[in-house]
């Protein structure tokens, strides 16, 4: 049975995914994605990054998770917890999924990501240092998912 919610009853829940990076000399798909950021540096850009540009989600999944059983979703390799946004307003309505294995990244790739810009009116306009210090758990539980 579905219930129609009234505006005062609605609540916005967010599901965000994140990853941890490991600095390396060379990378594959994530490096190609970083190269494509030149098309979308400004948020109001009319450019589009398409599948034909060679970016496939399964290529971002670390090899030890990239099996035929979990190729499109890292079902066996993540942490999850109830948390908050990392930038103001820091709302606490977020479920985080963090990829367990670290993804490879290079210094050059990180420089490309740091050129990305935020929407107009932000100062500074660059999308870097958009994090906050690690927060206390405050009674939250972090779950490590081994298998679904």
Swiss-Prot record:
As recorded in UniProt, its EC number(s) are: 4.2.1.1
Q: Name one GO cellular component term.
A: extracellular region
Q: In which tissues is it expressed?
A: Component of the acid-insoluble organic matrix of the aragonitic skeleton (at protein level).
Q: Which GO terms fall under molecular function for this chain's record?
A: carbonate dehydratase activity; zinc ion binding
| Required co-factors | Zn(2+)
User: What sequence ranges are listed for the domain Alpha-carbonic anhydrase?
Assistant: 1-146
Q: Where is it mainly found?
A: secreted
Membrane-spanning ranges: none
Swiss-Prot/TrEMBL catalytic activity = hydrogencarbonate + H(+) = CO2 + H2O
Q: Where in the cell is it found?
A: Secreted
The answer, when asked if Zinc is one of the entry's keywords, is yes
For the protein in the UniProt heading, the enzyme class is: lyase
Of which family is this protein a member?
Answer: Belongs to the alpha-carbonic anhydrase family.
Purpose of the protein: Reversible hydration of carbon dioxide.
Q: What is this protein called?
A: Putative carbonic anhydrase
Organism name: Acropora millepora (Staghorn coral)
């Amino acid at each position: 049975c579905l219930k129609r919610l009234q505006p005062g009853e609605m609540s916005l829940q967010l599901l965000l995914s994140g990853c941890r990076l490991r600095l390396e000399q060379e990378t594959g798909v994530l490096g190609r994605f970083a190269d494509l950021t030149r098309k979308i540096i400004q948020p109001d850009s009319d450019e589009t990054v398409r599948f034909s540009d060679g970016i496939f989600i399964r290529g971002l999944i670390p090899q030890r998770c990239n099996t035929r059983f979990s190729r499109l979703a890292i079902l066996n390799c993540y942490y999850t917890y109830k948390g908050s946004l990392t930038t103001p307003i820091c709302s606490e309505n977020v479920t985080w999924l963090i990829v367990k294995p670290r993804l490879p990244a290079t210094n050059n790739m990180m420089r490309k990501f740091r050129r990305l810009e935020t929407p107009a009116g932000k100062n500074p306009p660059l999308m870097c240092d958009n994090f906050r210090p690690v927060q206390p758990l405050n009674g939250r539980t972090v779950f490590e998912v081994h298998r679904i």
